[in-house]
Amino acid sequence: MEAAGALWRRRMQELARGAGKPHAPLFVPLIMGCAAQIEAIPAIDMVRDGTRLRKNLSELRRMLKLDALTCAVPSCMEAEAVGVEVSQDQWPPRIGTTAQVDVTAEIDADRLAASPRIAAALDAVRQIAVDPGEPVIAAALTGPAALVAQLRAAGVEAGDEAIYDFAGRILATLARLYAEAGVNLLSWHEAARPAEEQDDFWKGALGTAGNVARFHRVPPVLVLPASLAAGPWPAQAVPCPALNHPPLPPVRTHARAWAADPAGWPCLPVEGVAERLILTDAEVPPETEIATLKAQVERVRGE
């Protein structure tokens, strides 16, 4: 009989190919900062230490009886890795206001991999992936439009085409790094859909990163809030619309995004649904107490 971890990893590979049979969805809430409560340390310290990150995330996953854990959440780490200053005294970090970034430069994969938070996340992934009995390992990253907004907020000046190309190359490089480390699921999270004149550049960035993910048999999932998702869903990524998003014909919705606040989570569907994956649209608030989180996870599972 196929072990649960192996079963879910195979299902994620099928999702990347648009294949496979319907099944009860994999529940992957974006949990990161909450895990620091296990050691009673600041989250910003935990996310810079691969071993601590692995231990705390794995322990919290076991406490919550989840079949997946998330080793990275959207938290400005992509911008930080290319030279943007971010706050180091709070979680999640915030973008600084000045940066010298050349968007025409080649992406240095070694530099990205050496950025402290990315290095710790990759280290944690490798440690977890060594055990074939472990569950699905996910990485949730900043979407290209959100990354462009962060770069511009930091003072990076560039035209739309150049800066979206830069964002796409960053995310493609990270997709390769995470996939090679052992991640089974990649998601890109947007706060807003870009303006119409930027749409083609945005789709190009999604395609650049998504193609790399699919090459490694990892599904590239796009999470976009319902209130900001005007226009057809881009074909470059697996659609993961918000819970109240209208249907996406002719696209089949194999993933769904719930709100980050556990108090608003509905009950998990069991069988007979198209969704094979349920994420949260952002990180679960890090101040959420583990006992509260556990009670909410048990509630949505009907326990």
Swiss-Prot record:
The gene is apc5. This is Acetophenone carboxylase epsilon subunit. Keywords: ATP-binding, Cytoplasm, Ligase, Nucleotide-binding. Acetophenone carboxylase consists of five subunits; a heterooctameric subcomplex of two alpha (Apc1), two beta (Apc2), two gamma (Apc3) and two delta (Apc4) subunits assembles with the epsilon (Apc5) subunit in an unknown stoichiometry. Inhibited by zinc ions, carbamoylphosphate and beta,gamma-imido-ATP. InterPro entries: ApcE. GO terms for cellular component: cytoplasm. It is found in: Cytoplasm. It catalyses: acetophenone + hydrogencarbonate + 2 ATP + H2O = 3-oxo-3-phenylpropanoate + 2 ADP + 2 phosphate + 2 H(+). Its EC number is 6.4.1.8. The epsilon subunit dissociates during enzyme purification. However, Apc5 is required for acetophenone carboxylation and the enzyme complex is reconstituted using recombinant Apc5. It comes from the Bacteria. GO terms for molecular function: ATP binding; ligase activity. It comes from Aromatoleum aromaticum (strain DSM 19018 / LMG 30748 / EbN1) (Azoarcus sp. (strain EbN1)). Its main location: cytoplasm. Induction: By ethylbenzene, toluene and acetophenone. Divalent metal cations. Magnesium or manganese are required for activity. Catalyzes the carboxylation of acetophenone to form 3-oxo-3-phenylpropanoate (benzoylacetate) in the anaerobic catabolism of ethylbenzene. Also carboxylates propiophenone at the same rate and 4-acetyl-pyridine at lower rates. Its cofactor is Mg(2+); Mn(2+).
